[in-house]
Amino acid sequence: MKIGLVKANFPGERRVPLLPKDIKDFKNEILVEEGFGKFLDIDDQEYSDKGCHILSRAEVFAESEAIFSLKLIQPTDYYHLREGQMIIGWTHPFGSGQSFMKEQALPKKLIVVDLDSNSPCIYYENEIFESGIPKGLLYKNSFYAGYAGVLDALLQYGLIPTEETKIAILGSGNVAQGAFSSISKYSSNIRMYYRKTMSIFKENYTKYDIIINGIEIGKDDDPILSFSEQKSLKKGTLIIDVAADAGNTIEGSHFTSIDAPIYENAGKYYYVVPNTPSLIYRNVSQELSKILSENIFRKDCSRFIEKVKPLNK
């Protein structure tokens, strides 16, 4: 199968998900956009030496049966997408990718292979199929999201925590673990809350100086911090949403970017950057390339089409 890799044009994105050193025994033909590895100083020739075809962005879209885009494909590229094409990457169908699914995936009958760490699935014509991709495959990327996001938020806010700084972390998954690993180097005054202990957090949330969210709630779930609860927070409270569940877990919050990571509202400060692993792209690219090579690129990606064949007749 012909798989095209395009440079992510998502704001601030620098990760390179496939490195030449990991290209070996691929069952797919790889088409790479010119300058794909520039953030890691990788020349096009290094990809060409591994058997990849180097093309312009438009040519990659036109000639590929599947497009791999690490982050959500942006509206500027919508016109490139053609009916029945496969899209592989983090598409967040129920989150930031809802408009993409509605405006592109459904009308163009795209086969969307979403690489969600907890539940990688295939989305096609309003149906969801098992992808066969192992769950938790990209857990290190989630860990780095929490780790790097917390560091960046603290520096952008202008504060290194001390033992006097009261810190709450919501969640127990990979993102929350990364957040704890990062912030615990500066303070031990940290309380972690899980879904089962959220009632205790609700009793104490106004005491905290920093609240770090590592939970992504369901589309029909109530927010963990409602509008009214946010009003009760101390002036200057920093809310770091490293799960980047904008508008959901923290009601009314909105995405920020690496270039403008924090906004203030009613004396509270919000950090909701959706691609924090890109802050440490040199580390993350190494991890991603190895895992994606073994589990996505090396195996014939036409296997994903087989999964949706009952509807694709």
From Swiss-Prot:
Other comment: No enzyme activity is detectable in the reverse direction with NADP(+) and chemically synthesized N(5)-(L-1-carboxyethyl)-L-ornithine as potential substrates.
pH dependence of activity: Optimum pH is 8.0. Active over a broad pH range of 6.5-9.0.
E.C. numbers: 1.5.1.24
Residues noted as binding NADP(+) in the record, renumbered to the chain: G171, S172, G173, N174, V175, A176
This protein's GO CC annotations: plasma membrane
SMART domains (alphabetical): AlaDh_PNT_C (SM01002), AlaDh_PNT_N (SM01003)
InterPro entries: AlaDH/PNT_N, AlaDH/PNT_NAD(H)-bd, CEOS, NAD(P)-bd_dom_sf
Protein name as catalogued: N(5)-(carboxyethyl)ornithine synthase
Record GO biological process: alanine catabolic process; ornithine metabolic process
Record field: catalytic activity: N(5)-[1(S)-1-carboxyethyl]-L-ornithine + NADP(+) + H2O = L-ornithine + pyruvate + NADPH + H(+)
Keywords: NADP, Oxidoreductase
Species of provenance: Lactococcus lactis subsp. lactis
Described function: Catalyzes the NADPH-dependent reductive condensation between pyruvic acid and the side chain amino group of L-ornithine to form N(5)-(L-1-carboxyethyl)-L-ornithine. To a lesser extent, can also use L-lysine as substrate (yielding N(6)-(L-1-carboxyethyl)-L-lysine). NADH cannot replace NADPH in the condensation reaction.
Temperature dependence: Stable to heating at 50 degrees Celsius for 10 minutes. Rapidly inactivated by heating at 60 degrees Celsius.
Binding annotation for pyruvate: R15, K71, H92
Pfam short name (any one): AlaDh_PNT_N
Activation and inhibition: Is potently inhibited by the reaction product N(5)-(L-1-carboxyethyl)-L-ornithine.
